[in-house]
Amino acid sequence: MRRNGKERKDRTAGRPQRQGQEVAGRAWIFRGAHRGRVTRKNIIWHELIGLKAKVIRASHPELVGIEGYVLDETRNTLVLVGDRVWVVPKDVVEIEFDLGNEKIRVNGKDLVGRPEMRLKKRWRK
């Protein structure tokens, strides 16, 4: 569409179209003080945003090996940002979270659900 002889743009100039694209490659953003509180027992209920994650196993072979920091979390997906932005489905992967001094493997099916709803779930201990 043209207005006053000029072409309209779909988005603001200089801004990326995909969420998280502007922080790709900037790992320093995710250094937080909350990491010490995450343990093997409470990671299912804990906030995942900001944690370093790596896909260990997946039903789709291209997902294996993706690593980065968790940028966003929805009901069925995790958005990982490393050298680029990846949207990873939770229910088909096994994810390893790196907490600095320990690595925790979690089946993605245990993470399915909105973060606030996972708190209400009862898990067998």
UniProtKB/Swiss-Prot annotation:
Q: Region entry Disordered: which residue ranges?
A: 1-22
Give the molecular function GO annotations.
ribonuclease P activity; RNA binding
Biological process (GO) annotations held by this record are: tRNA 5'-leader removal
Q: What class of enzyme is it?
A: hydrolase
| Keyword Cytoplasm recorded | yes
- Which Pfam families has this protein been placed in? RNase_P-MRP_p29
**Localization terms from the record:** Cytoplasm
Q: Which UniProt keywords apply?
A: Cytoplasm, Endonuclease, Hydrolase, Nuclease, tRNA processing
Source domain of life is: Archaea
GO cellular component terms, alphabetically, are: cytoplasm; ribonuclease P complex
Q: What is its EC number?
A: 3.1.26.5
Give the catalysed reaction(s), semicolon-separated: Endonucleolytic cleavage of RNA, removing 5'-extranucleotides from tRNA precursor
Assembly and interaction partners? Consists of a catalytic RNA component and at least 4-5 protein subunits.
Q: What does this protein do?
A: Part of ribonuclease P, a protein complex that generates mature tRNA molecules by cleaving their 5'-ends.
Family to which the UniProt record says this protein belongs: Belongs to the eukaryotic/archaeal RNase P protein component 1 family.
According to UniProt, the name of this protein is Ribonuclease P protein component 1
Q: The organism's lineage?
A: Archaea, Methanobacteriati, Methanobacteriota, Thermococci, Thermococcales
